UniProtKB/Swiss-Prot annotation:
Compartment(s): Cytoplasm
Record GO terms (molecular function): fructose 1,6-bisphosphate 1-phosphatase activity; magnesium ion binding
Biological process terms in GO annotation: fructose 1,6-bisphosphate metabolic process; fructose 6-phosphate metabolic process; fructose metabolic process; gluconeogenesis; sucrose biosynthetic process
Residues the entry annotates as binding Mg(2+) 1: 92, 115, 117
Biological classification of the source: Bacteria, Pseudomonadati, Pseudomonadota, Gammaproteobacteria, Vibrionales
Name of the protein: Fructose-1,6-bisphosphatase class 1
UniProt entry keywords in alphabetical sequence: Carbohydrate metabolism, Cytoplasm, Hydrolase, Magnesium, Metal-binding
Requisite cofactors: Mg(2+)
Length: 338
């Protein structure tokens, strides 16, 4: 059996590459790992206990909240507050950012933004779901209560980002700006083990992921690109394969490994797109760029967008470089919206 490297060992090893590292970020990633194991346990038994389904309320996006959404939100929030590295959390499930006012938290360097359970409506039908997280250094003075400005930073200021995918196996994938690495959970040992080091997405792919049920509502450029994907041109390996799970983490993870593009454009119903810039697009864009891919709103680099509100939405195109550039060219050529 080859030498097995755990997530904890890997984090410490990478920390040693930076002579001035304090260990705070490593400890924070350890908190995320712990919360992920707790949430993974509940997801695995969700069909046996009364924790699936909707609770009858909506989040700030107007989306029906699932019981596991709130469970995951509470567990990740508690894990962050219990350590002294985080001064506040912004979550897709919370109307406002949550600041931690204990002395030990006010002296923390970092804020975290998260989608605690992406794709949670799929749990009832046993489809993979995930957690997405994004970490920034605070810009407000250490020792004070964090401000809105700490959370409204462009994605190019992220110091770390990642996701956990709860599927046939559970994986944690993360970057600190020096490559992207994946760890698979071994339930018999209770540890995440390095399984995918320095992940890279192919420059070209043959998979496109989009909810084609909304085709009639898409901008003209996106419609033209879908037709391009469907054309029978064997010399260009077309038609491409359409694969759409409906869970961003799951679709992203597959395309990262195999090559492809994930698209959630603006529609007549969602003119600014549906995905959240801070909780979904920025962390996934950071990961994708570290893997050699591209993330765009159809015109601009996602990581260069300066957010103006916590729950801001944007169109999102992410994946293999040549595929994202191709859809951008169609959007530029056919600027009509719908």
């Amino acid at each position: 059996m080859p030498n097995m490297k755990t997530l904890g060992e890997f984090i410490v090893e990478k920390q040693n590459d930076f002579p001035h590292a304090s260990g705070d970020l490593s400890s924070l990633l350890g908190s995320i790992k712990l919360a992920a194991k707790i949430v993974n346990r509940e997801i695995n038994k969700a069909g046996l206990v009364d924790i699936t389904g909707a609770i009858g309320s909506e989040n700030v996006q107007g989306e029906e909240q699932q019981k596991l959404d709130l469970y995951a939100n509470d567990k990740f929030k508690a894990a962050m507050e219990a350590r002294d590295q985080v001064c506040g959390v912004a979550s897709e499930e919370e109307d406002e950012a949550v600041t931690f006012n204990k002395d030990l938290n006010r002296n923390a360097k970092y804020v975290i933004l998260m989608d605690p359970l992406d794709g949670s409506s799929n749990i009832d039908v046993n489809v993979s779901v995930g957690t997405i997280f994004s970490i920034y250094r605070r810009v407000s003075p250490i020792g004070t209560t964090p401000t809105q400005d700490d959370f409204l930073q462009p994605g190019n200021q992220q110091v770390a980002a990642g996701y956990v995918i709860y599927g046939s196996s559970t994986m944690l994938v993360y970057t600190t700006g020096n490559g992207i690495h994946g760890f698979t959970y071994d339930p018999s040992l209770g540890v995440f083990c390095l399984s995918h080091e320095n992940m890279q997405i192919p420059e070209d792919g043959q998979i496109y992921s989009i909810n084609e049920g909304n085709y009639i509502r898409f901008p003209q450029g996106v419609k033209k690109y879908i037709k391009f994907c469907q054309e029978d041109v064997p010399a260009d390996n077309r038609p491409y394969t359409s694969r759409y799970i409906g869970s961003l983490v799951s679709d992203f993870h597959r395309n990262l490994l195999k090559g492809g593009i994930y698209m959630y454009p603006s529609t007549a119903m969602y003119p600014n797109g549906k995905l959240r810039l801070l909780y979904e697009c920025n962390p996934m864009a950071f990961l994708m760029e570290q893997a050699g891919g591209v993330a765009s709103d159809g015109k601009n680099r996602i990581l260069d967008i300066t957010p103006t509100e916590l729950h801001q939405r944007v169109p999102f195109f992410v994946g293999s470089t040549n595929m994202v550039k191709q859809v951008e060219s169609f959007i530029e050529e056919y600027p009509e919206q719908h």
